[in-house]
Amino acid sequence: MSRRVEFDMSHEDHTDRRRTNTFSSEEDGVPNEVADYLVYFSRMIDEQNVPEILTLYDQAFPDLTERFFRDRMWPDENVVERIIGPGNKLFIILYKELYYRQLYARNARGPLLVHRYESFMNYQELFSELLSSKDPIPLSLPNVWLWDIIDEFVYQFQAFCLYKANPGKRNADEVEDLINIEENQNAWNIYPVLNILYSLLSKSQIVEQLKALKEKRNPDSVADEFGQSDLYFKLGYFALIGLLRTHVLLGDYHQALKTVQYVDIDPKGIYNTVPTCLVTLHYFVGFSHLMMRNYGEATKMFVNCLLYIQRTKTVQSQQPSKKNFQYDVIGKTWDQLFYLLAICLAVQPQRIDESIASQLAERCGERMMHMANGNVDEFRNAFSTGCPKFLSPTTVVYEGVNQSKEPLLRQTQSFLEGIESQMALPVLRGYLKLYTTLPTKKLASFMDVDEENYDSFLGKLLTYKMIVNELGKEAGPSTVDDDEPQTDIDFYVDRDMINIADTKVARHVGEHFLRHIQKLQEVQDVLKRLDSAGQKP
């Protein structure tokens, strides 16, 4: 039984509002409770009452959907306009954004082409209102709704690209309409999608502001009235992460990381207020590092994200029933992260959080053992399970074979080429752990390397050394609070002799607690000074 959400409305107020329009509960088939909700929702948008908007969006909408619209759609825009009255263009646009999002969520095969087209036109109208205004729009929305707008926009673009590459997703009547859309390039084309996201960045000056913050400068010094607007700043921030995701789906990992180079991946970031945003950021940054063979940084991102999901698992378990109209990022990504983490640790073993390590061993222990022994099929299966749904924005198939999986096959091949070039590394590491000194010729014989391939073998040895060294290079904030090495082995080559050092050290639990006791004492001292300052007359 879903919990009903009550609205603090004046009966006289909302009745008067509905007397001025042509709404009829019997004719339009809309329950009075839903009509009251829409009137109140519209009023809260006008008043910019963010806490109340959050309740109406986050709790009331799913609650009413569960009770009244399990088997049918919410009323269309014309009925809603008769309920709330004319002159509420912005609310109608926002309502339609929710309407189409629910339409996508409840259709396993995806909505009809006409609904995909109408949804894009509604997004275009929304962003046009925001971007073409001479002054910042007087609109305040909760962080989670702002993120959901950007996230759903990118998701629907991805869904359209997969739809037009798969003839099995549409009926015969839609082919002609799709031909017309593609010829005119007026819906879900890559260029307007990227243009909208980059325009949000430009309008909000988000990159300049984040760069200023990173350089310890005042962000207001590089921002105009749009950049200083809370609405535009947050939309620009979330658009950065939307662009990160888009570039990864297109296979441009360097540009993806460049897009978020000034985003401070810190627990106190804006994205932390929206769990799905935090998970999206860490997943796609980590995946970009993995595809660029920076396995150490990828591991940090994946472990950080898994720890966050683990800590908030109780809350997140309530999300599907609470937001049944949303794309459940967290639930799906939880499994994907383990497969990607298994790949990273099979190629480049390192110490990670013990709770995550135990779950990883339970889920993927046997798979990792096969990968460490050079089983290419295990790498392929883990990658296919953990990767996102890649897309090709220019591929259109009007009839014939489904080509929506072609981008996945290309990215899988690219990934495996990188893995195959390093396939010997896990085996190499296994031999090095057995010795403190080892002649290069002897190691080569262990690995069945003949004289002709000896030079290339030395190259692989140097490659492994570079991977070990790479762990010391911080591309982001450290996930550990000590200086312990992340790998359990290090070595150097002196002429024809390999010198190996076991870098695995015992964890100094006592020192860990002492450090945090000191930090706690410092915080308490600051609080005492603030308290004494506040009590002064």
Curated annotation (Swiss-Prot):
Pfam families with a match to the protein in the record: Paf67
Keyword hit for Metal-binding: no
PCI domain ranges (all copies): 297-485
Any one GO cellular component localisation term in the record: eukaryotic translation initiation factor 3 complex
One annotated GO molecular function: translation initiation factor activity
Localization terms from the record: Cytoplasm
GO BP annotations, alphabetical order: formation of cytoplasmic translation initiation complex; translational initiation
Extent of the signal sequence: none
Matches recorded under PROSITE patterns: PCI (PS50250)
Region described as Disordered: 1-28
Keyword check for Metal-binding: no
Keyword terms: Cytoplasm, Initiation factor, Protein biosynthesis
Biased composition (Basic and acidic residues): 1-19
Record HAMAP family: eIF3l (MF_03011)
Family to which the UniProt record says this protein belongs: Belongs to the eIF-3 subunit L family.
Function of the protein: Component of the eukaryotic translation initiation factor 3 (eIF-3) complex, which is involved in protein synthesis of a specialized repertoire of mRNAs and, together with other initiation factors, stimulates binding of mRNA and methionyl-tRNAi to the 40S ribosome. The eIF-3 complex specifically targets and initiates translation of a subset of mRNAs involved in cell proliferation.
The protein's assembly and partners: Component of the eukaryotic translation initiation factor 3 (eIF-3) complex.
Descriptive protein name: Eukaryotic translation initiation factor 3 subunit L
Species this protein is from: Caenorhabditis briggsae
Gene: eif-3.L
